[in-house]
């Protein structure tokens, strides 16, 4: 018998934002502009949307490839078909980050053309790969691509700025649909601000459709994360205020909530397994960021039972008055 749980709608909008069954269909291969061809990785799914986007960039006979998909045979067949039909070759392979749905096709490409093994670039490179430095330029006919270090989603994450189009290949930092995840939320939010400061108009994400208004999308991402973090802090502040007693307890570690208690305070009645599998990652990211910002503390001990609490603000003393005091 199915069990009906009174889930809060706000949670499901968050959890399902990138897994909507109504995602627009994307062609296996698409010419997006005179400089950019997109080839889907053939790996659609809840975590990959329509699949990993890989891009051939440039206008001449030699093109830059950004990301390589998950390593499925269908992707190799697709990209080889594009290369042959356009009579073009690959000059550089640029990897946005280390995740397997972006790097998995590298061995297949090298098997197809062994000379490509000398032209694979990634920040914090694996064996046989070459490093990418922040600001490094990769150029082919019709395309100047600048690497931009944007960690947070991963420690090595790079975006790539296509100067001729004022466009940004956003990797997994910003998706065409829904929201991304970030193990290091603090650095991720810094990266979003950095990306916004680049002033790019167009976004080519690693998953999902082209982002036609990148500034608005970045503003949405930044606002979304800030609201979620502030929501967690508000829950902990209310809990502290609830349990604080008389003046003698001010400044002490009063109250405190476990991860599950925080989740239920924000989203209502949610089963433990849903919290652990779907909600805990972001909650932990936000709590650690708030800890780094010295707005939240925690009690040491078992991580599952650990209590998190809002740090009390120190009251500032009024400035001391100098000079004579009038007497009655």
Curated annotation (Swiss-Prot):
Active-site residues, Swiss-Prot/TrEMBL: 101 (proton donor/acceptor)
Enzyme Commission number(s): 3.1.-.-
Keywords, alphabetical: Hydrolase, Metal-binding, Zinc
Keyword Zinc: yes
Domain of life: Eukaryota
Annotated residues for binding of Zn(2+) 2: 101-102
Pathway note: Secondary metabolite biosynthesis
Entry-linked Gene3D superfamilies: Ribonuclease Z/Hydroxyacylglutathione hydrolase-like (3.60.15.10), Winged helix-like DNA-binding domain superfamily/Winged helix DNA-binding domain (1.10.10.10)
InterPro entries: LACTB2-like_MBL-fold (IPR047921), Metallo-B-lactamas (IPR001279), RibonucZ/Hydroxyglut_hydro (IPR036866), Sec-metab_biosynth-thioest (IPR050662), WH-like_DNA-bd_sf (IPR036388)
Record: residues binding Zn(2+) 1: 97, 99
A GO BP entry: secondary metabolite biosynthetic process
Cofactor note: Binds 2 Zn(2+) ions per subunit.
GO molecular function list: hydrolase activity; metal ion binding
Cofactors demanded by this protein: Zn(2+)
Function: Lactamase-like protein; part of the gene cluster that mediates the biosynthesis of neosartoricin, a prenylated anthracenone that exhibits T-cell antiproliferative activity, suggestive of a physiological role as an immunosuppressive agent. The non-reducing polyketide synthase nscA probably synthesizes and cyclizes the decaketide backbone. The hydrolase nscB then mediates the product release through hydrolysis followed by spontaneous decarboxylation. The prenyltransferase nscD catalyzes the addition of the dimethylallyl group to the aromatic C5.
Family: Belongs to the metallo-beta-lactamase superfamily.
Annotated protein name in UniProt: Lactamase-like protein nscB
Lineage, highest ranks first: Eukaryota, Fungi, Dikarya, Ascomycota, Pezizomycotina
């Amino acid at each position: 018998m199915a069990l009906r749980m009174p889930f809060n709608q706000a949670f499901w909008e968050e959890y399902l934002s990138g897994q909507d069954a109504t995602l627009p269909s994307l062609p296996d291969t698409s010419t997006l502009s005179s400089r950019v061809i997109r080839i889907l990785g053939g790996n659609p799914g809840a975590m990959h949307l329509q699949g990993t986007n890989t891009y051939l960039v440039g206008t001449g006979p030699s093109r830059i490839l950004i990301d390589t998909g998950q390593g499925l045979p269908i992707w190799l067949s697709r990209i080889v078909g594009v290369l042959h039909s356009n009579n073009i070759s690959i000059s550089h392979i640029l990897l946005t980050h280390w995740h397997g749905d972006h790097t998995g096709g590298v061995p297949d490409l090298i098997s197809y053309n062994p000379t490509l093994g000398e032209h694979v670039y990634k920040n914090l490179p694996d064996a046989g790969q070459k490093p990418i430095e922040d600001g490094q330029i990769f150029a082919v006919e019709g395309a100047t691509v600048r690497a931009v270090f944007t960690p947070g989603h991963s420690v090595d994450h790079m975006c790539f700025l296509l100067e001729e189009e004022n466009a940004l290949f956003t990797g997994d930092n910003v998706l065409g649909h829904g929201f991304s995840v970030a193990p290091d939320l603090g650095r991720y939010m810094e990266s979003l601000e950095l990306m916004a400061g680049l002033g790019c108009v167009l976004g080519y994400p690693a998953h999902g459709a082209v982002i036609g208004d990148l500034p608005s999308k970045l503003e949405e991402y930044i606002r979304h994360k800030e609201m979620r973090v502030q929501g967690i802090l508000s829950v902990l502040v209310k809990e502290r205020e609830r349990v604080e007693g008389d003046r003698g307890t001010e400044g002490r570690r009063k109250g405190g909530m476990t991860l599950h208690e925080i989740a239920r305070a924000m989203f209502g009645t949610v089963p433990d397994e849903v919290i652990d599998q779907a909600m805990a990652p972001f909650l932990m990211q936000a709590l650690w960021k708030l800890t780094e910002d010295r707005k939240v503390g925690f009690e040491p001990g078992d991580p599952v039972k650990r209590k998190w609490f809002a740090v009390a603000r120190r009251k500032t003393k009024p400035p001391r008055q100098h000079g004579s005091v009038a007497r009655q």
